Amino acid sequence: MPLSHEEWQFAGTQRAGLYGWFARLYAEEVSEPVYRSHFADGGFAPFAGLAELSLEAEVQRLDAAIATLRAEQLPRLELAADFAQLFLLDGKTSALPYASAYTGTDGASPLFGAAEARMRDFLAASGLSIQADFREPADHLAVPLALMAELAGAASSAEDIPTAAAAQADFLRTAVLDWLPRFVERCQQARPRFDVYPALAALLLGFVRADVAFLEDVGGSAAVS
């Protein structure tokens, strides 16, 4: 599917923003300012447009989860408790947000393993590094999502659109889709008090799959070196 440079640039800007928000929501618990500006008045506004990508059910699920949360007396603190339960405890009862926890054949790969080293290689190849105040290994889910935001934004001005699209699709398949479905499954099994984070995980998986399909369509037969 050929795109004009204007269409590609617009898509890149929109995609970068979405990946940036997903990265932020997994990097840390929702702050009070973010809760007030993006959760307190309804569904999560930055993701509303994803319903147009055949993700209406996932968006509606997230909106319903946020509505249930908002009925609580201290909703942001409840959400923070769910964040801790899901992402900060041991792997037996939570959904660890690290690729190394899911990429082994037996589901018991050591943390800081090959997946973490591979993500550091991706960062180095892109001339990027993890922010000093983010004290997590490189295979934390927020890292490839943040890198994808950078790639989508930087490639919006690329002259060779098919090659840029193919490179991004290859990165998503290798660094994200290789383990994201298993992480999403664990999020559903962990059963936190509210459905916000399980719903968010399902929406993320649907978005990444839709984005890869879009990039493959744009990239066509372009080779990725």
Role assignments for model-derived ranges:
Residues 1-225:
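Surface/interface-facing alpha-helical segments and adjacent flexible terminal/loop regions used
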